[in-house]
Amino acid sequence: MIGQCATLLDIVLTEQPEPIDLQCYEQLPSSDEEEEEEEPTEKNVYRIEAACGFCGKGVRFFCLSQKEDLRVLQVTLLSLSLVCTTCVQTAKLDHGG
């Protein structure tokens, strides 16, 4: 550039333009795969039996849960003691809450 403003003659192109592929080749998951991911896991009814923390009598209840959640309940029950309704009534343990 010799003058104050650049002219087209002053600009020298050394590289040639190349075509660019603008096509996106990303693949979206099919509708079958999406349905499998969105389906909730199956819940089953489980019977839970434990001994009363006071008298040792059997305490039973049922829950509806997934298998993974049942494992969490099992670990929790290791640190808790369930109490039967008879012991709650006779020992007046109904504190509410």
From Swiss-Prot:
SUPFAM superfamilies membership: E7 C-terminal domain-like
Motif LXCXE motif, chain ranges: 22-26
Sequence similarity: Belongs to the papillomaviridae E7 protein family.
Gene3D superfamilies reported in the protein's UniProt record: 3.30.160.330
GO biological-process terms attached to the record: DNA-templated transcription; symbiont-mediated perturbation of host cell cycle G1/S transition checkpoint; symbiont-mediated suppression of host innate immune response; symbiont-mediated suppression of host type I interferon-mediated signaling pathway
Keywords from the named record: Activator, DNA-binding, Early protein, G1/S host cell cycle checkpoint dysregulation by virus, Host cytoplasm, Host nucleus, Host-virus interaction, Inhibition of host innate immune response by virus, Inhibition of host interferon signaling pathway by virus, Interferon antiviral system evasion, Metal-binding, Modulation of host cell cycle by virus, Oncogene, Transcription, Transcription regulation, Viral immunoevasion, Zinc, Zinc-finger
Keyword Transcription: yes
Subunit structure: Homodimer. Homooligomer. Interacts with host RB1; this interaction induces dissociation of RB1-E2F1 complex thereby disrupting RB1 activity. Interacts with host EP300; this interaction represses EP300 transcriptional activity. Interacts with protein E2; this interaction inhibits E7 oncogenic activity. Interacts with host TMEM173/STING; this interaction impairs the ability of TMEM173/STING to sense cytosolic DNA and promote the production of type I interferon (IFN-alpha and IFN-beta).
Superkingdom classification of source: Viruses
Motif (Nuclear export signal) on chain: 70-78
Chain segments carrying region E7 terminal domain: 1-39
Modifications the protein undergoes after translation, according to the UniProt entry: Highly phosphorylated.
Zinc finger intervals, unnamed: 52-87
Protein localization: Host cytoplasm; Host nucleus
Record keyword Zinc-finger present: yes
Entry text on domains: The E7 terminal domain is an intrinsically disordered domain, whose flexibility and conformational transitions confer target adaptability to the oncoprotein. It allows adaptation to a variety of protein targets and exposes the PEST degradation sequence that regulates its turnover in the cell.
Protein name: Protein E7
Gene this protein is translated from: E7
One cellular component term from this protein's GO annotations in UniProt: host cell nucleus
Function field: Plays a role in viral genome replication by driving entry of quiescent cells into the cell cycle. Stimulation of progression from G1 to S phase allows the virus to efficiently use the cellular DNA replicating machinery to achieve viral genome replication. E7 protein has both transforming and trans-activating activities. Induces the disassembly of the E2F1 transcription factor from RB1, with subsequent transcriptional activation of E2F1-regulated S-phase genes. Interferes with host histone deacetylation mediated by HDAC1 and HDAC2, leading to transcription activation.
GO molecular function: DNA binding; DNA-binding transcription factor activity; protein domain specific binding; zinc ion binding
InterPro entries per UniProt: Papilloma_E7
